[in-house]
Amino acid sequence: MQELDLIIVGAGPVGLYAAFYAGMRGLSVAIIESAQVAGGQPQNLYPEKLIYDIAGLPAVTGADLTKNLLEQLAQISHRLFLGEGVQKIEKEDGIFSVITDKSNRKAKAVLLTTGAGLLKPRKLGIDNEENLANEGKISYFITSLKEFEGKNVAVFGGGDSALDWSLMLEKVAKEVHLVHRRTAFRGHEMTVDRVMDSGIQVHTPYTFSNFNENDLELKKVKAEENLNFSIDKILVNYGFLTNQVSLAENLEVSRNGRVKADSMMQSNIEGLYVAGDASDYAGKMPLMSVGFGEAVHAINAMTKNLEFNHPLRGGHSSSIF
């Protein structure tokens, strides 16, 4: 394969949009993604969950967002390689080699949009949890709301995911019980208000005690008080453990494993840029909408800092399409 202008590692929302914008600017671009499906977390973990904080979209599901991004990407020339895990990134004589488990591709610049890395859900921590998960009694994310239709569901967690999923489940489930070990929730204030005004049964401060057949027992924190009710399914929203893998030698990362970026979204390695949840800098906000802007910033920076042997287009779509 001939040398590219840009290789993007990661085909989540930020990576897909970055590829579109790079192509719009006239860069030859390829995206490499380890999963078999593009779209990152919104597509693979919560395709039916509504996302509210993307400009111009009052609400969009993870699946529809991915569909829209792929349609947008189809407007420009690009290569998308799915099911390829990047193992190492090397640089020699100003050219990057992106080495995967299937190939070795070369480019003048690399943009990392790998998100939070490999994700592993935090579990309840009970003895028979794996068996209950295999039986479909315990889940950590939802790919189809139909599985919960007419069911009594208990959601464990106190953040935005637990709150959002409780509201989504209320539309299809028979009963929704939201369980949090603290009295106050960590989610967005507006979402907390919506939950409190809904028919969701909120149990705070309670923790898991026992689950036998369909009987769920909760224990009140710092009190000798238990609750019991019938539950068909448990959804655990305790977040995810991340495993960021350093792909390039001497690449500077922060304590949380994310890549340190300067004001141009460039790492300490010239030509190696980062955007989205994979990046870290002072004042970083881990929001998808912020990641889109970071990707644009990185691509505009590389068009100025690197030498390309062909003319580039301007940064305004109205002058291109």
Curated annotation (Swiss-Prot):
It is an enzyme of class 1 (oxidoreductase). Its cofactor is FAD. Keywords: FAD, Flavoprotein, NADP, Oxidoreductase. It catalyses: 2 reduced [2Fe-2S]-[ferredoxin] + NADP(+) + H(+) = 2 oxidized [2Fe-2S]-[ferredoxin] + NADPH. SUPFAM superfamilies: FAD/NAD(P)-binding domain (SSF51905). Pfam families: Pyr_redox_2. FAD binds at E33, Q41, Y46, V86, L119, D277, S318. Belongs to the ferredoxin--NADP reductase type 2 family. One of its GO terms (molecular function) is flavin adenine dinucleotide binding. Transmembrane segments: none annotated. InterPro entries: FAD/NAD-bd_sf (IPR036188), FAD/NAD-binding_dom (IPR023753), Fd--NADP_Rdtase_type_2 (IPR022890), Ferredoxin-NADP_redctase_2 (IPR050097). Gene3D superfamilies: FAD/NAD(P)-binding domain. Its EC number is 1.18.1.2. It comes from Lactococcus lactis subsp. cremoris (strain MG1363). Homodimer. This is Ferredoxin--NADP reductase. Binds 1 FAD per subunit.
